[in-house]
UniProtKB/Swiss-Prot annotation:
Chief location category: membrane
Disulfide-bonded cysteines: none
Keyword set, alphabetical order: Cell inner membrane, Cell membrane, Membrane, Transmembrane, Transmembrane helix
Residue spans, topological domain Cytoplasmic: 27-44, 88-152
Membrane topology note: Multi-pass membrane protein
Organism: Salmonella typhi
HAMAP family given in the database record: UPF0266
GO cellular component annotations of the record: plasma membrane
Presence of the UniProt keyword Mitochondrion in the record: no
Name of the protein this chain belongs to: UPF0266 membrane protein YobD
Family membership: Belongs to the UPF0266 family.
Entry-linked InterPro entries: DUF986
Record topology, Periplasmic segments: 1-5, 66
């Protein structure tokens, strides 16, 4: 096994750990989930570039008769990238004392002000940071509003 294979295994393990944390562990942290809302995906161009570069590496490894193990590991990396970028949906998860946004726990008392833009983006101003929450379904904004009113 080469150093390349070890690095690929490390990246695959990291992506798998992230996917498991995001899908199974994070919703169970910090109490029961009160509301889970699907968000819009960010630009997919980065994911297209990543999967495209991995596909080029697979092609290069196959045409140069590289190690078959490396080809399988590159294929697994491409599949993990495909899952994380295209199948998994980003979510905002509301709990009793706060919420998870982009895998970061934010308590409700950190919210200094909230606004709704004309194009349906909920803007939450924290102490030093602004969160732009783009929901997939515009009706979910009302659910978020009701939940925040009940918990504040």
């Amino acid at each position: 096994m080469t150093i390349t294979d070890l690095v690929l295994i490390l990246f695959i393990a990291a992506l798998l750990a992230y996917a498991l944390y995001d899908q199974f562990i994070m919703p169970r942290r910090n109490g029961p989930t009160l509301l889970s809302i699907a968000l819009l995906r960010r630009g997919r161009i980065d994911s297209v570039i990543f999967v495209g570069l991995v596909a080029i590496l697979i092609y290069n490894n196959v045409t140069s008769h590289g190690a078959q193990m490396t080809t399988w590991l590159l294929s697994a990396l491409a599949l993990m990238g495909f899952y994380i970028f295209w199948i998994r949906t980003p979510r905002i998860i509301f709990k009793q004392r706060g919420f998870f946004f982009a895998n970061v726990w934010i308590e409700y008392n950190r919210i200094k002000e909230m606004n709704l833009s004309e194009d349906g983006v909920l803007v939450m101003q924290l102490e030093q940071r602004r969160l732009l929450i783009r929901v997939r379904n515009i009706d979910d904004l009302e659910k978020i509003y009701k939940l925040l009113i009940e918990n504040q």
